[in-house]
Structure formats: C-alpha cells, structure tokens
Amino acid sequence: MVLEGNPEVGSPRTSDLQHRGNKGSCVLSSPGEDAQPGEEPIKYGELIVLGCCEEGGEETEAQRGEVTGPRAHSCYNGCLASGDKGRRRSRLALSRRSHANGVKPDVMHHISTPLVSKALSNRGQHSISYTLSRSHSVIVEYTHDSDTDMFQIGRSTENMIDFVVTDTSPGGGAAEGPSAQSTISRYACRILCDRRPPYTARIYAAGFDASSNIFLGERAAKWRTPDGLMDGLTTNGVLVMHPAGGFSEDSAPGVWREISVCGNVYTLRDSRSAQQRGKLVENESNVLQDGSLIDLCGATLLWRTPAGLLRAPTLKQLEAQRQEANAARPQCPVGLSTLAFPSPARGRTAPDKQQPWVYVRCGHVHGYHGWGCRRERGPQERECPLCRLVGPYVPLWLGQEAGLCLDPGPPSHAFAPCGHVCSEKTARYWAQTPLPHGTHAFHAACPFCGAWLTGEHGCVRLIFQGPLD
C-alpha cells in the first residue's frame, strides 16, 4: 500500500511514490526464518578490500626509489597493519540478520526547503532528501522491508556503518600528513540482500546517517525520472564493474559504471564529481555478481559470493603450494644459496635471508645481493647478471588473500614492481583490470598491496634456477 503524503510537513502537493517490491505495510520476519541457536547464519557474500594498507606501513625499495638492502614490505596482504578489528577490517562477511532491517521507498513529498529539518525530525523514519533549489525540496520516505537486510559501508565509525573503510592510496601506501583528506564518503553506499533464495545482493549509492537520512544538496547531481520519481548521484560517486564471464579462469574485465542513489546504472561522468550524469544503461542492473568491483573513490572492494569462494583456493592450499615450492629447493643462480618463501606466520618485518628476489623486467629469481646497481639509470635500477636487463629488483611475497585469486594454480607469476606472487591467470586478470584513480584516471594495480603496475604486461613469469622452472 502506497501511503498519501502528510500535509503537516508543509507540503503544497504530494505525489504517490511508485516502487518495486511487495505492497503492504511493515511486516515482521516470519517465525522460523532465522538461524536457530548453534546454526551458522546464511552468508550472502564477502567484501574484500583491494590493497588494504594503513598508516605506518613502510614503502618497498621500488616505491621509495632506493636500493639499500632488505627492508620491510609496505602491504599487509590480506590483513590490516593493526589487525582486523571490529568493523574496520580487510574483509567482511555479510550474513542474514536475526531481524530484517531493509527499507524500501514509500511516499514522496514536495515541501519548502526551510521546512526540511522539521520534516526529517523522526529518527526512526528513513528518508532521502533532494534539494532542488533554496525554496523547493523533495523528500522520499522509506518504510521497513521485511524481505531484505541492509548493510552500510563508509568512512564513518558511527554505529549505523557495518563496514568502516579508509583510503588506500596509490602505490600501496596510506594517505599521510595533516593535509591528507579522505575522498571516501562517510556514508558511501548500502547493499540490500534478499533474505530468501537466491539471496540476491543489490548495491545503492549513499548510506543513511545517524538520523536515518540521506541528503543530496543543491549542488549534487539529481533529476526527476520519466515516471515522476527522483534519483541522484553522490559527490564522488560509487562505481561498479562486473567481470565478463564471472570471476573464474576465463574472466575478463568488464566496463565501469556508476550506481545511483536508487540503484540505477549509468555510464561514467566526465569527471568523478561532475554535475552532469552519464547515460542510463537500461540492460544492466545493480545486482552484485561474483567478482564485482565496487569503487568508493579512495578504496576498491571485491564482492565474492559463497559459490565463488568455494572455487577459490583455501589458505591451506596456498600453504601447501608454498611448501611444495620450497621443497623443490630453488637456488640463486649466482650465489648458489637455497631460496625459500617465508611462512606467513613469521610476519612481514623484513625479507628473510633465504627470501627469493626477482628482477621484474626479466623474471629471473635470485637471492638478495647488494651489487649490480645502475645509479646512472636511477637508484632503484639493477642489472640482471643473467640477461643484463636493467630494472627494479624486489623481494617475492606469496599473495595470502585467497579471495583475490581466480584459480588455485601454482604461484608462477609476480606483479611488477611489488613482487607479489600468484597464479598466471590471476596475475594476468588483475594486470588487465583498470582500477579508478583520482577524478577520471584508471590504472591497473596489484590487488594484494595496491601498487600501480608497471612494464608492458604488469606482471612477469618467474624463472627459477632448478626443478621449479
């Protein structure tokens, strides 16, 4: 049932709001729908932060432009520097709540702008306010939806935010200094998941604040839709990319789109904060798929479905691959020392003495040595003693965030210039995937640390001396 607008809020006229979904007033969750005590709640999916890093991480030699010896790596490769705590984590599982908290549009009011604060005084009433001018605003009230669960994502640490996300700066570092300002909105986006199979997840730009409101100011991009409803975009936008062919061995990057406050799909604006919206893409939806990327202008999230995670390698498989690689006893072709990938449990303080190092231009793997610097080519340039190619020389680290991997293939390739190691198909997919950067630029980056990829291919096949090759 669509309710008539309340004239007491100062509305000269009220329009009925048409919306999709079941009609009717608030209905509580049906008995028996929720997980019983001791049962695992139904998982809708997981969000994984790409290249999650925090302040205090040290730069790699390649990023710092120095070659002075082994040093701590900057990325945290599947975990925040201070550890995953509370709502601030490197990944978050979205599971069915004990009670539905979703909302859906209900009534639209046209009111005088000065009366907006009075109209929105009810904290229990979710609403979106569109300021059209100094004298005219449109308020869309939302009502409880017993069929969906809502999860909110943003920079704010207030209780209504389920997943607190901070900026991941280009190159695998974190924004530092007093002048560094976050470009992620405090209430960036919201995801609504159906509580019944197939548990579809849909993404919407903007989240509700502590007063259960979303405000689109006079300068925000907003418009009236052909059916008389309202829609708009947030200041820096919420971009989504669905991979072609799903998130699997045959995946290819899709096309980046922008999601509106009401969940419609548009082509990208000329720049991130431009007031002119893109064109409506009618044959695409805001439904998240396995491998969908969500960019919040400062951090990029990967959505994995439960079915997709079953196909991904497990941490046990990654550990077995590490042990298998070490069991082959690869050697440094110059120093003839045995190389070994360190255990993730050892931590990331500094490269181990047996740590493999790679010349990222050619892929030849060596042990660490302090010679071969080519200062005339720059402080980070070294000459490979086998093929004489000059380029960055970095330690190799096995990628430990299994959810970022397309397949359980052997660790045969490394990203350039950071040195994170994964399977060939995983490396090639991410090297071909442009991630948003700044107001209108795109650049491929390592999914484990966020470092911008360099070179012709962005990754290199590793050439070991010994049985591994």
From Swiss-Prot:
One of its GO terms (biological process) is innate immune response. GO terms for molecular function: ubiquitin protein ligase activity. It holds the Pfam family Pellino_FHA. Phosphorylated by IRAK1 enhancing its E3 ligase activity. Pathway: Protein modification; protein ubiquitination. The modification Phosphoserine is found at residue 11. GO terms for cellular component: cytosol. Its EC number is 2.3.2.27. Residues 1-39 are annotated as: Disordered. It catalyses: S-ubiquitinyl-[E2 ubiquitin-conjugating enzyme]-L-cysteine + [acceptor protein]-L-lysine = [E2 ubiquitin-conjugating enzyme]-L-cysteine + N(6)-ubiquitinyl-[acceptor protein]-L-lysine. Highly expressed in brain, heart and testis, and at lower level in kidney, liver, lung, placenta, small intestine, spleen and stomach. Isoform 1 is not expressed in lung. Keywords: Immunity, Innate immunity, Phosphoprotein, Transferase, Ubl conjugation pathway. Belongs to the pellino family. Interacts with TRAF6, MAP3K14 and MAP3K7. E3 ubiquitin ligase catalyzing the covalent attachment of ubiquitin moieties onto substrate proteins. Involved in the TLR and IL-1 signaling pathways via interaction with the complex containing IRAK kinases and TRAF6. Mediates 'Lys-63'-linked polyubiquitination of IRAK1. Can activate AP1/JUN and ELK1. Acts as a regulator of innate immunity by mediating 'Lys-63'-linked polyubiquitination of RIPK2 downstream of NOD1 and NOD2, thereby transforming RIPK2 into a scaffolding protein for downstream effectors, ultimately leading to activation of the NF-kappa-B and MAP kinases signaling. This is E3 ubiquitin-protein ligase pellino homolog 3. The gene is PELI3.
